[in-house]
Swiss-Prot record:
It comes from Homo sapiens (Human). GO terms for biological process: aortic valve morphogenesis; atrial septum morphogenesis; atrioventricular canal development; atrioventricular valve development; blood circulation; branching involved in blood vessel morphogenesis; cardiac chamber formation; cardiac muscle tissue morphogenesis. PANTHER family: T-BOX PROTEIN-RELATED, T-BOX TRANSCRIPTION FACTOR TBX20. GO terms for cellular component: chromatin; cytoplasm; nucleus. This is T-box transcription factor TBX20. Residues 327-340 have a biased composition (Polar residues). The gene is TBX20.
Amino acid sequence: MEFTASPKPQLSSRANAFSIAALMSSGGSKEKEATENTIKPLEQFVEKSSCAQPLGELTSLDAHGEFGGGSGSSPSSSSLCTEPLIPTTPIIPSEEMAKIACSLETKELWDKFHELGTEMIITKSGRRMFPTIRVSFSGVDPEAKYIVLMDIVPVDNKRYRYAYHRSSWLVAGKADPPLPARLYVHPDSPFTGEQLLKQMVSFEKVKLTNNELDQHGHIILNSMHKYQPRVHIIKKKDHTASLLNLKSEEFRTFIFPETVFTAVTAYQNQLITKLKIDSNPFAKGFRDSSRLTDIERESVESLIQKHSYARSPIRTYGGEEDVLGDESQTTPNRGSAFTTSDNLSLSSWVSSSSSFPGFQHPQSLTALGTSTASIATPIPHPIQGSLPPYSRLGMPLTPSAIASSMQGSGPTFPSFHMPRYHHYFQQGPYAAIQGLRHSSAVMTPFV
């Protein structure tokens, strides 16, 4: 008995559009189209940066897209290495571009990091690189103009993790989907050849980020992936209007293997952290004061003494207050944070320039601002010096007592320990100021 297959039910055009077969085929075509438009060129670029030759033998990439090693041999062509990031041109680079050489500055510092395994922090807002890529060029035409730019390419298609028990990086799996590749054009471009011969080019403003939606021009990287910075130099022609079309331009690419780094969100190797703190001049906040040398410590102390913000103007000096006398004239003046270049203490300036209503400075006290050579003893506390003079017992001095004291070794100031703040300041800033401004306000001794 023969069985005949029943004919497939015919679906309408509207129903056929929502069938499983139609949805799968349309989804596959869209995914394929998106892959061809976005991922494919970048995948070729990733493979281009890690194929054929080891990084140790790579020195430069000419305009034909071929690597030039130290021995002068070029790698064999590979199906994986078909197109670099910068469009290649079939024209062989001119002799002028072939003569250009590029050297890495601070190579010794890069070597130290490379031995430990360089790590670079990436953040959402962007983080600058340290060490910084600094290069110098030779063999350029002094009369020509050049554009210098930099990009950072993945070393391989692997993701890494740090093994703390082994203090080394291990392969953790396949790399994450590649992020949009960006070229960083040096902000001072175009350079003249004469400028490139006289100065080095620093990419200190380059920032690394892991924000895929970054709109600030930072270089986007994946964490726990290894990257290789590359420096490009392009000869600018008269018709070069922008850097968007590089197909007709002559360029050279230089690679320095010691600049390979791993992008991280937090340092993994403690030795890298220590080396960055010790080498980075902007990381002094992380250093312990015990690491300072004697010369550095003396310079810091002298800097503190020269600036008035090092000590509050209403803070009393430690220990007993010095009084003006015969012994103080032979003793050098105690160092003060208020001492200026002309040895005029800030307290004397306050006492001579600011007065309160109802009080008139003695004539000899106002002369402190003009004659300081005869005074070799420290000036009392700023606020204390601004008050009417009192005897050692805390009683106000009469004008005759003041005049007699001026004829001797100078005015007599209280030697007992004074409270830190006057009761005017305990009222709050606004109330204290209003009290001082009142016409009938009279300053009273510290209580």
